[in-house]
Amino acid sequence: MKVALLMSGGIDSSYSAYLLQEAGHEVVGIYLKLHDNDLKHAQNIQNIEKVSQKLGIETHIFDAKELFKKHVYDYFVDSYQKGLTPNPCAFCNPFMKFGFALERALELGCEKIATGHYARVKEGRIQEAKDQSKDQSYFLFGLKESVISRLIFPLGDRLKSEIKPEALEILPWLGTLESYKESQEICFVESDYIDILRRHFPVEQKGIVQDSSGRVVGEHKGYMQYTIGKRKGFTVKGAHDPHYVLSIDPKENRLIVGSKEELAKNVVYADPFALPEGFEHFEGEVKIRYRSLKVKAEVRLDESGRLVAHLKEKVYGVANGQALVLYAEDLVIGGGWILDSSLKS
């Protein structure tokens, strides 16, 4: 089978190319230029060319910067301006890696597309990876069934800790790729997301900090530098116990802070993004952010079309803009973008 592989220049995607060949597939490499860091692109492409030459793989480089800016970068920047906490990786996947890249793969005559994601496919759905510590199923919740049917994840049944030693034993020359930095959570952010926002907004505008009763208790450095649940970077006069960001008011450049218990929520509201056809009601588990544990929940659509998840236990740090992802055991059912949350008795 002819399979397109999204290549990054690192060991994971390079070893994936070898595994696909070992499984009998004809591999075609694809590299996407998404951001404006040309130095990083040059290093990645140099690595990819080396891998392609060694394995005899045809590779194609596509410049998708304009599309990426429209669908992902602008969304990222706009979200922070609105006081939200965006999830650019989950937002990128349906549009870029499994949208634009899949279209290019089909044009090249490929039947399927593979990536180095730590995830699996089962029964037409995204399944969690064997390596729970590296599982990336959360970021893939937005993929349509028609896309999932074309996916291959060569690393999904492997442990991350075993891949590098195994790869270097079989393909010792992969050691020359060691200068490749392990991919960050956000590909276009070098060190701190604030550096990106600083190009567009005056992010250091100080503002007031209030407690949940409206009393002014301190000062912060600029609302875009905070997310729900953050407990550092602002002052609270006379405080002896930790204070956490409860909400962000972008119009007034104001933070509302309180105790950890005030941060607790058990109802989450989300804008549906990817749901099974005919979805009305679901009982299973949900995740409110990438590194959170799954929580049992009952989820339904309300009269206005919002997803409403009633959680069986309290969660902390629910941030508007993040993804609410639904799981039936280890299978991703769908999800949406968090709009709000509350605590109900």
Swiss-Prot record:
The record lists its disulfide bonds as C92-C187
Can you list the GO cellular component terms from the UniProt entry? cytoplasm
Q: Where is this site: Interaction with tRNA?
A: H117, Q322
Principal subcellular localisation of the protein? cytoplasm
Q: Which SUPFAM superfamilies match?
A: Adenine nucleotide alpha hydrolases-like
- Gene Ontology biological process: tRNA wobble position uridine thiolation
Which one Pfam family would you cite for this protein? tRNA_Me_trans_M
Where located?
Cytoplasm
Q: Which UniProt keywords apply?
A: ATP-binding, Cytoplasm, Disulfide bond, Nucleotide-binding, RNA-binding, Transferase, tRNA processing, tRNA-binding
| EC number of the protein | 2.8.1.13
- Please give the residue ranges the record annotates as the region Interaction with tRNA: 134-136, 289-290
Which InterPro entries would you find in this protein's record? MnmA-like, MnmA-like_C, MnmA-like_central, MnmA-like_central_sf, Rossmann-like_a/b/a_fold
Quote the catalytic activity from the record.
Answer: S-sulfanyl-L-cysteinyl-[protein] + uridine(34) in tRNA + AH2 + ATP = 2-thiouridine(34) in tRNA + L-cysteinyl-[protein] + A + AMP + diphosphate + H(+)
Q: What Gene Ontology terms describe what this protein does at the molecular function level? A: ATP binding; tRNA binding; tRNA-uridine 2-sulfurtransferase activity
Active site residues according to the UniProt entry: C92, C187
Q: What class of enzyme is it?
A: transferase
Residues that bind ATP: L6, M7, S8, G9, G10, I11, D12, S13, L32, G116
Under the heading CDD domains, the entry gives: MnmA_TRMU-like
| Listed HAMAP family | tRNA_thiouridyl_MnmA
* Entry's family note: Belongs to the MnmA/TRMU family.
Q: What does this protein do?
A: Catalyzes the 2-thiolation of uridine at the wobble position (U34) of tRNA, leading to the formation of s(2)U34.
- Would you tell me the protein name for this molecule? tRNA-specific 2-thiouridylase MnmA
The gene is mnmA
